[in-house]
A protein has these predicted regions:
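Ligand-binding clamshell of periplasmic/extracellular solute-binding protein-like
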Residues: 44, 48, 64-71, 81-95, ...
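Short, low-complexity disordered leader/linker segments with a strong preference
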Residues: 1-30, 325
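Ligand-binding pocket segment of bilobal, Venus flytrap-like solute-binding proteins
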Residues: 73-74, 152-240
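Alpha-to-beta junction loops
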Residues: 56-58, 76-90, 147-149, 197-207, ...
Length: 325
């Protein structure tokens, strides 16, 4: 009798253990190429991950490891679906600018779906600057040949691309002499660029449109700022024209740039896993709660399946490479 009871208890324990194992969520590590938890890289990846985990039944967490480690992790992962990356244009720009080797090129990883965009890139100046737009800044330089405008950008980044587009347009539209009156100043993170502006060490900075709103219209002349050019259309932004609206072009076409956030996998990712993420990402981007959460952060969902996303990001890389060269 005791033996029978013991056997029954053993069978029950094994069943419970099996059930618990069957119901255990898959652990997924989402790495990003930033070490910050306050910027768009983390905020977008975290929001996408929460909703994607719900659709996929994951236990997932964003790990802000920084660009160098992110590349290594994705490159060396076994492709079983327990590690993915979500990151913006620096995924290819790091290689284009020569910061990282060709072994980290898009051809050596797998492009997943596009899941989000940040359209908020802009250039800002102090409120009392003698120009209100980037075109007016070029006109100011033309009228004042001894003047210069110092523009703070981060080396090898989206800000560098946006500056190059403006510089090349000034060169084509106003000539070498006016273009030479523009000086790019290497700067670090956003807070550093703002301090450089307030200290009078630069005249224009690359920033985030929503980030500078706290300084627009303030009484403190030392801190007061204004937007002089948006890189893309932003709903409700009426205080500054976009590059396109100002007539700033590249290769004869209006220039616009948003940060595009895509999912990336190791090269040997399981095909069924990638297909499932595509389907889940499509549902996430249609989810009204997700749209609302993204809007609160001033970002937006922007779904493309893996195939379309690959074509999109490869074409964008080609265009940005032409701009750099």
């Amino acid at each position: 009798m005791k033996r029978r009871v013991l056997c029954m208890l053993l069978v029950l324990a094994m069943a419970v253990t099996c059930l618990a194992g069957c119901n255990r969520k898959k652990s997924v590590r989402v790495v990003i190429g930033s070490s910050s938890t306050s910027g768009d890289s983390y905020l977008i990846a975290d929001t996408v991950t929460r909703y994607l985990a719900e659709e996929m039944g994951w236990d997932a967490k964003v790990d802000p490891v920084g660009a160098a480690e992110m590349f290594e992790i994705i490159r060396n992962d076994k492709g079983k679906g327990d590690t993915i990356a979500i990151f913006h244009d620096m995924m290819y720009l790091g290689v284009v600018f020569g910061t990282y080797g060709e072994e980290y090129a898009l051809e050596n990883i797998t492009v997943g779906p596009r899941v989000a965009q940040n359209p908020g890139c802009c250039f800002a100046a102090k409120a009392d600057a003698p120009y209100n737009t980037l075109v007016e800044a070029a006109e100011y330089l033309k009228a004042n040949p001894d003047a210069e405008i110092r523009v703070a950008c981060e080396n090898g980044s989206v800000s560098t691309l946006c500056y190059l587009a403006y510089y090349n347009w000034v060169l084509d539209s106003y000539g070498q002499e006016v273009a030479d009156q523009l000086r790019v100043i290497a700067a670090g993170v956003t807070s550093e660029k703002r301090q450089m502006l307030w200290d009078g060490n630069v005249d224009i900075i690359f920033d985030d449109y929503y980030g500078i709103q706290q300084y627009v219209g303030v009484d403190d002349k030392q801190l007061a700022m204004k937007c002089v050019g948006l890189l893309d259309e932003i709903e409700g932004a009426v205080d500054a024209p976009t590059y396109a609206e100002q007539g700033i072009t590249f290769n004869g076409e209006p220039f616009a740039l948003s940060k595009d956030f895509l999912v990336y996998y190791p090269q040997n990712i399981d095909a069924d896993f990638a297909k499932a993420v595509d389907a889940a990402a499509a549902k996430v981007c249609e989810n009204e709660s997700f749209k609302s959460d993204m809007a609160k952060l001033n970002y937006r969902g922007a779904y493309l399946d893996s195939s379309a996303a690959k074509d999109f990001i490869y074409n964008k890389r080609t265009e940005m490479t032409q701009l750099i060269e």
